């Protein structure tokens, strides 16, 4: 019996939501070799320091670590190599225009399988300042306290 792994995140970049304000997301395919996709299916991928750039009308993902496949022998490739992302031309043009602004970056948020293909959820993001991070933590804590009080009140 085949497990249903569709849209189940194989890797998430949790630090991205803390360090960046994400204002637009894109779903992109990723070009991988055979041994890389096998490692991705085993969830041996890290998105922590990843980012993407537009070069010559193509989007390239850098600094994403995919561990070498254990039985891959000579077919394994470099772990941190740049990988091509598959997006529509209109999306690439929009991303290129946004990235030309200052303080904007294009980062991977999660990797998942969709219809057997590896997909990367990418986000256009602006870096948060330290006081923004503290403010969002306070807001999150206040919301938790309110939810806790409502739960106690409704019992």
UniProtKB/Swiss-Prot annotation:
Q: Name one GO molecular function term.
A: RNA binding
Q: Cite the SUPFAM superfamilies for this sequence.
A: Small protein B (SmpB)
Pfam family, any one: SmpB
Biological process (GO) annotations?
Answer: trans-translation
UniProt keyword terms in alphabetical order = Cytoplasm, RNA-binding
Keyword Oxidoreductase attributed: no
Q: Which cysteines are joined by disulfide bonds?
A: none
Q: Could you tell me which InterPro entries the record lists for this protein?
A: SmpB, SsrA-bd_prot, SsrA-bd_prot_CS
Q: Which PROSITE patterns match?
A: SSRP
Its GO CC terms are: cytosol
What is the annotated localization of this protein? Cytoplasm
Family membership noted in the UniProt record: Belongs to the SmpB family.
Q: What does this protein do?
A: Required for rescue of stalled ribosomes mediated by trans-translation. Binds to transfer-messenger RNA (tmRNA), required for stable association of tmRNA with ribosomes. tmRNA and SmpB together mimic tRNA shape, replacing the anticodon stem-loop with SmpB. tmRNA is encoded by the ssrA gene; the 2 termini fold to resemble tRNA(Ala) and it encodes a 'tag peptide', a short internal open reading frame. During trans-translation Ala-aminoacylated tmRNA acts like a tRNA, entering the A-site of stalled ribosomes, displacing the stalled mRNA.
- What's the protein here called? SsrA-binding protein
Lineage, highest ranks first = Bacteria, Bacillati, Bacillota, Bacilli, Lactobacillales
């Amino acid at each position: 019996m085949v497990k249903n792994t569709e849209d189940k995140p194989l890797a998430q970049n949790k630090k991205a939501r803390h360090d960046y304000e994400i204002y637009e997301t894109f779903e992109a395919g990723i070009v991988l070799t055979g041994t890389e996709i096998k490692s991705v299916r085993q969830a041996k991928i890290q998105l922590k320091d990843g980012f993407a750039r537009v070069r010559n009308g193509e989007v390239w993902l850098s600094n994403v670590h995919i561990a070498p496949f254990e039985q891959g022998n000579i077919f394994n490739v470099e772990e941190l190599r740049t990988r091509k992302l598959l997006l529509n031309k209109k999306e690439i043009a929009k991303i290129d225009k946004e990235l030309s602004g200052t303080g904007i970056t294009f980062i991977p948020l999660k990797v998942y399988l969709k219809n057997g293909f590896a997909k990367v959820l990418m986000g256009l993001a602006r870096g948060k300042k330290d006081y923004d991070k503290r403010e969002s933590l306070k807001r999150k804590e206040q919301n938790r306290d309110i939810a806790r009080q409502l739960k106690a009140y409704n019992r």
